[in-house]
A protein has these predicted regions:
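Extended interfacial segments that mediate partner engagement and assembly in macromolecular machines
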Residues: 1-35
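Short, aliphatic-rich beta-strand segments
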Residues: 5, 48-57, 107-110
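A short glycine-rich, hydrophobically flanked beta-strand micro-motif that places a catalytic Asp/Glu
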Residues: 35-44
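Residue-level recognition of well-ordered beta-strand positions that form the cores
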Residues: 41, 53-55, 98
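Short strand-connecting beta-turns/loops that link adjacent beta-strands
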Residues: 45-48, 102
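Rossmann-like S-adenosyl-L-methionine
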Residues: 57-206
Length: 206
């Protein structure tokens, strides 16, 4: 259980690699930002939009808000502070992403707390593989646990209508927003578990 200290992480995106040491250096200079800081989470995109969540074991007050806002401008990131039953959003709690899939651009917004694919290149390859192996159809598509519409939105171009389910409120909100960003109107997102969907399909529940 020995702790191994590292000063860089080569498997994350170049932008996160660049921001990490700058962020840690600036945090270490301010006791209010450093005090009981438990963890840091990064949510980035290929557009270099970067959301950083600072997680604390203490309540965050106005002094923290002021310093976090200064930190945002110094590093050009978006910051959220989290502690028990507390979420402090300094500017925004989401990032913008643009994916080029089969030579077509799709716009997405990823919200903090929602599920996202961590490897953008692999994600694009997965979506393209599915699209390239499905013929255009006049039939409908049902997708379970759709997240923020990562597969749903590109796949909607292949089908008449799409019904997509998800249990996360955050993901459903993002999915509906992502439909608007891409001017897609043939998808209906509903909040429902797979078990509930099967019950509805079998007419066990309304």
């Amino acid at each position: 259980k020995n702790i191994l200290e590292i000063d860089s992480c080569q498997i994350v995106s170049p932008h996160i690699q660049e921001v990490m040491p700058k962020l840690l250096e600036l945090i270490s200079k301010e006791k209010e930002l450093e005090d009981k800081l438990f963890g840091i989470e990064f949510l980035g995109s290929t557009t270099n939009d970067l959301l950083v969540t600072l997680i604390y074991h203490r309540k965050l007050g106005e002094a923290w808000n002021i310093l976090a806002k200064e930190l945002e401008s110094k590093v050009t990131i978006k910051i959220i502070g989290r502690s028990r039953k507390q979420k402090q959003i300094i500017s925004e709690d989401l990032i913008s992403e643009k994916l080029n899939i089969n030579n077509k651009d799709y716009n997405f917004e990823y919200q903090e707390g929602g599920f996202t694919q961590p490897n953008t290149n692999v994600n694009i390859q997965m979506i393209e593989w599915v699209l390239n192996n499905i013929q255009d159809s006049s039939k409908d598509l049902c997708e379970l646990y759709c997240g923020g519409g990562n597969f749903t939105i590109p796949l909607s171009t292949k089908f008449n209508k799409v019904l997509a389910t998800e249990i996360s409120k955050t993901s459903i909100k993002s999915a509906r927003r992502n439909c608007e960003l891409n001017n897609i109107s043939n998808i209906e997102f509903i909040r429902m578990s797979a078990e509930e969907f099967v019950q509805a399909l079998n007419k066990v529940r309304a």
